[in-house]
From Swiss-Prot:
It comes from Acanthamoeba polyphaga mimivirus (APMV). It is a multi-pass membrane protein. Disulfide bonds: none annotated. It is found in: Membrane. Its main location: membrane. Keywords: Glycoprotein, Membrane, Transmembrane, Transmembrane helix. This is Uncharacterized protein R495. The keyword Protein transport does not apply. GO terms for cellular component: membrane. Glycans are attached at residues 57, 115. The chain crosses the membrane at residues 12-32, 75-95.
Length: 140
């Protein structure tokens, strides 16, 4: 039995839309007061790692609240649609490449690493994992 059903995909799309709407409302409201706690640095990444490609403003590419929110979204995706690692890595890299075009600062190394880590953890904890013991009868 596979857990990738039409209902799960619909729920995932609704969840992502809901999170993006809340994200935008919060960002708009907090930008007026300049106290957006999600912009606070949580972990400082070594300069050689975050500036691997020498992109502009790479020195600000540390782990912040927004990075963890994205990792949490990927965690939820991993719970609902597990074991699609290559697709998740490609999507994560493409989104980081597109960020400068929509006005966000990209984190070319840290973003995909955190997103993939969130997805892997969600995928490992997913109740939708294939049961290879029953499917292939190789373990007894």
């Amino acid at each position: 039995m596979s857990c990738i059903t039409t209902n799960n995909v619909k729920r995932l799309i609704i969840l992502i839309i809901f999170v993006v709407i809340i994200w935008q409302f919060y960002y708009y409201a907090s930008s007026k007061h300049n106290n957006n706690f999600l912009n606070e640095k949580i972990a400082i990444v070594p300069h050689d790692i975050k500036c691997l490609f020498n992109q502009p403003n790479c020195s600000e590419a540390d782990v912040d609240g927004w990075s963890l929110v994205q990792a949490f979204i990927y965690f939820v995706v991993g719970l609902i649609i597990p074991n699609k690692y290559l697709i998740i890595i490609i999507v994560s890299i493409i989104l980081e490449i597109l960020k400068p075009f929509i006005g966000y600062e990209p984190k070319y190394i840290i973003g995909p690493l955190l997103n993939t880590t969130g997805y892997i953890v969600g995928s490992m904890l997913s109740p939708c994992k294939n049961n290879y013991k029953e499917k292939y009868q190789i373990f007894e």
